[in-house]
């Protein structure tokens, strides 16, 4: 019984320490940040704090990254997509959202400058608001997908999962050797960033996560359907959804639940 008691005590203390480590320094503080445009290091981002924010409760932190020619405002308003890629409504107050503005309406990430922006935003937000530091996520379409991929490569230790919508290796991949939960969503007829490139990106994390290799399924062209491939044996989950479509920020049409549902379920299950 004494041994069992010591074991239980060790487990309990370990759980408490893990919880404490995952809790940002902003927990328990009266926040100074407010909803709307924030400035940091000469760059801008839009912050969305849920109504009824409670500084004693830990929130997920979700980055929504815009496409080439888009802006942080487009992510927030839902211009050609659902607002916040459809994730805010699904979060039901459980997440704080950030939409940064890229330079020249994109994410070239020269010298890692956009990765550094995400680092700075994380530091500022978490110093002021209560974030579960084990629950940071990023998603984006096209160039925003490329930047999400770059974060998966360079900041796998900071982010729990990414969802890459019709992305390409266009924001770099510094590092790219560590495991992270990875979801790719791509149109089979994408004329801008072809699906084969998207599959290659996912396969990097199939390898990093120790998954069993598998062929990615694809729907028939003109079917209006999607096919999901969940890789097996992974240390962290890797999935890929191929859908009947092109280069679209809202796969199968604005309001279709495919990408928002898949992304939210993937993030919460990762």
Swiss-Prot record:
Cited SUPFAM superfamilies: alpha/beta-Hydrolases (SSF53474)
Annotated gene: faeC
InterPro entries according to UniProt: AB_hydrolase_fold, FaeB/C/D
Gene Ontology annotations for the cellular component aspect, listed alphabetically: extracellular region
Job description of the protein: Involved in degradation of plant cell walls. Hydrolyzes the feruloyl-arabinose ester bond in arabinoxylans, and the feruloyl-galactose ester bond in pectin. Active against paranitrophenyl-acetate, methyl ferulate and wheat arabinoxylan.
Name by which UniProt lists this protein: Probable feruloyl esterase C
Domain of life: Eukaryota
Species of origin: Aspergillus terreus (strain NIH 2624 / FGSC A1156)
Keyword RNA-binding: no
Span of the signal peptide: 1-22
Main location: secreted
Location of this chain's protein in the cell: Secreted
Secreted found in the keyword field: yes
Catalytic activity line of the entry: feruloyl-polysaccharide + H2O = ferulate + polysaccharide
GO BP: xylan catabolic process
Listed GO MF terms: feruloyl esterase activity
Keyword field: Carbohydrate metabolism, Hydrolase, Polysaccharide degradation, Secreted, Serine esterase, Signal, Xylan degradation
Family per record: Belongs to the faeC family.
EC numbers: 3.1.1.73
């Amino acid at each position: 019984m004494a041994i069992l008691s010591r074991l239980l005590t060790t487990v309990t203390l370990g759980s408490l320490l893990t919880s404490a480590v995952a809790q940002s320094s902003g927990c328990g503080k009266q926040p100074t940040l407010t909803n709307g445009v924030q400035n940091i290091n000469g760059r801008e981002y839009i912050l969305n704090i849920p109504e009824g924010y409670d500084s004693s409760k830990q929130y997920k932190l979700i980055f929504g990254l815009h496409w080439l020619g888009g802006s942080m405002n487009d992510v927030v308003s839902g211009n050609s997509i659902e607002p916040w890629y459809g994730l805010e409504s699904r979060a039901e107050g459980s997440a704080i959202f950030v939409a940064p503005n890229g330079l020249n309406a994109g994410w070239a990430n020269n010298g890692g400058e956009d990765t550094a922006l995400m680092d700075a935003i994380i530091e500022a937000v978490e110093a002021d608001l209560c974030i579960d530091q084990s629950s940071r996520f990023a998603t984006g379409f096209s160039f925003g997908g490329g930047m999400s991929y770059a974060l998966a490569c360079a900041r796998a230790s900071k982010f729990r999962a990414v969802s890459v919508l019709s992305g390409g290796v266009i924001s770099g991949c510094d590092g790219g050797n560590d495991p992270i939960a990875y979801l790719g969503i791509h149109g089979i007829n994408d004329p801008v960033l072809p699906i084969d490139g998207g599959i290659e990106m996912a396969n990097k994390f199939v390898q990093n996560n120790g998954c069993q290799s598998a062929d990615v399924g694809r729907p028939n062209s003109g079917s209006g359907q999607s096919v999901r491939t969940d890789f097996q044996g992974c240390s962290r989950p890797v999935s890929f959804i191929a859908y009947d479509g092109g280069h679209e920020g809202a796969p199968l049409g604005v309001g279709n639940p495919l990408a928002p549902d898949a992304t939210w379920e993937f993030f919460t299950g990762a």
